[in-house]
Amino acid sequence: MSRHQARKRFGQHFLTDDSVVEAIVRAIAPARGDRVVEIGPGLSALTQPLLRGLDHLTVVEIDRDLAARLRNAHAPGRLTVIEADALTVDFASLGERLRVVGNLPYNISSPLLFHLMAAADTVRDQHFMLQREVIDRMVAAPGSADYGRLSVMLQSRYRMDKLFDVPPEAFDPPPRVVSAVVRMVPLPADRLRPASEAALQAVVARAFAQRRKMLRRGLGDWAALVPWDALDIAPTARAEEISVEKFIRLTDALLQAGAVPA
């Protein structure tokens, strides 16, 4: 079979280091009966070892040439190929207790993470390889330089752990950045949740639009409607100092005041 040329428009960097593959598979720990979906299988570096531990695997591949290779290499009873952009896939329709894995295209990683949030109620866990700097932002604590919109939104929905770094030389072609692997486990149904996810997104986006501004200025005309003392938030605080819990309570207060549409 001819060698596949990585395509920049799809952000393709193929994992070639067997030791990294083994470490990722150990972290996932696939088992018979698991319902696993792999995003961006590429040249099957993860696909093959995953299949050894599974009855069946579903993959999402946008590259039609790679999708054809996958179909030709595996029996339909073992592998289902969804030839599509992962941003258009309704993951919630793929079953309950999904385990979603993959070496995500770095050029769409943040939009894809937000897209997957819509299916979090049907997901058991997620294991992804991403740029290290993105994962550092995902798991960042309030008060740190990496803490921002991505941190708040994802931490409101998942417990996340950065597992290990992956050097550029583990890929072909090597990316210009260090990568890392993250585990994401949806928080339970009884978690603190906003009355409206859309409202939380709106509040967090406005708060971090000018992250160095004091919150009372960053929120603009909403600031006058915030019960600062009741929320135990200093109006002079900056967005990067506000915990996820306080962002959720702030959002609910602004919803009750009619400032933010649900």
Curated annotation (Swiss-Prot):
<keyword id="KW-0963">Cytoplasm</keyword>
<feature type="binding site">
    <location>
        <position position="103"/>
    </location>
    <ligand>
        <name>S-adenosyl-L-methionine</name>
    </ligand>
</feature>
<protein>
    <recommendedName>
        <fullName>Ribosomal RNA small subunit methyltransferase A</fullName>
        <ecNumber>2.1.1.182</ecNumber>
    </recommendedName>
</protein>
<comment type="similarity">
    <text>Belongs to the class I-like SAM-binding methyltransferase superfamily. rRNA adenine N(6)-methyltransferase family. RsmA subfamily.</text>
</comment>
<dbReference type="InterPro" id="IPR023165">
    <property type="entry name" value="rRNA_Ade_diMease-like_C"/>
</dbReference>
<dbReference type="InterPro" id="IPR020598">
    <property type="entry name" value="rRNA_Ade_methylase_Trfase_N"/>
</dbReference>
<feature type="binding site">
    <location>
        <position position="13"/>
    </location>
    <ligand>
        <name>S-adenosyl-L-methionine</name>
    </ligand>
</feature>
<dbReference type="GO" id="GO:0003723">
    <property type="term" value="F:RNA binding"/>
</dbReference>
<dbReference type="InterPro" id="IPR029063">
    <property type="entry name" value="SAM-dependent_MTases_sf"/>
</dbReference>
<dbReference type="InterPro" id="IPR011530">
    <property type="entry name" value="rRNA_adenine_dimethylase"/>
</dbReference>
<keyword id="KW-0489">Methyltransferase</keyword>
<comment type="function">
    <text>Specifically dimethylates two adjacent adenosines (A1518 and A1519) in the loop of a conserved hairpin near the 3'-end of 16S rRNA in the 30S particle. May play a critical role in biogenesis of 30S subunits.</text>
</comment>
<dbReference type="Pfam" id="PF00398">
    <property type="entry name" value="RrnaAD"/>
</dbReference>
<feature type="binding site">
    <location>
        <position position="15"/>
    </location>
    <ligand>
        <name>S-adenosyl-L-methionine</name>
    </ligand>
</feature>
<keyword id="KW-0698">rRNA processing</keyword>
<keyword id="KW-0694">RNA-binding</keyword>
<dbReference type="InterPro" id="IPR020596">
    <property type="entry name" value="rRNA_Ade_Mease_Trfase_CS"/>
</dbReference>
<feature type="binding site">
    <location>
        <position position="40"/>
    </location>
    <ligand>
        <name>S-adenosyl-L-methionine</name>
    </ligand>
</feature>
<feature type="binding site">
    <location>
        <position position="61"/>
    </location>
    <ligand>
        <name>S-adenosyl-L-methionine</name>
    </ligand>
</feature>
<keyword id="KW-0808">Transferase</keyword>
<dbReference type="GO" id="GO:0052908">
    <property type="term" value="F:16S rRNA (adenine(1518)-N(6)/adenine(1519)-N(6))-dimethyltransferase activity"/>
</dbReference>
<dbReference type="InterPro" id="IPR001737">
    <property type="entry name" value="KsgA/Erm"/>
</dbReference>
<feature type="binding site">
    <location>
        <position position="85"/>
    </location>
    <ligand>
        <name>S-adenosyl-L-methionine</name>
    </ligand>
</feature>
<dbReference type="GO" id="GO:0005829">
    <property type="term" value="C:cytosol"/>
</dbReference>
<keyword id="KW-0949">S-adenosyl-L-methionine</keyword>
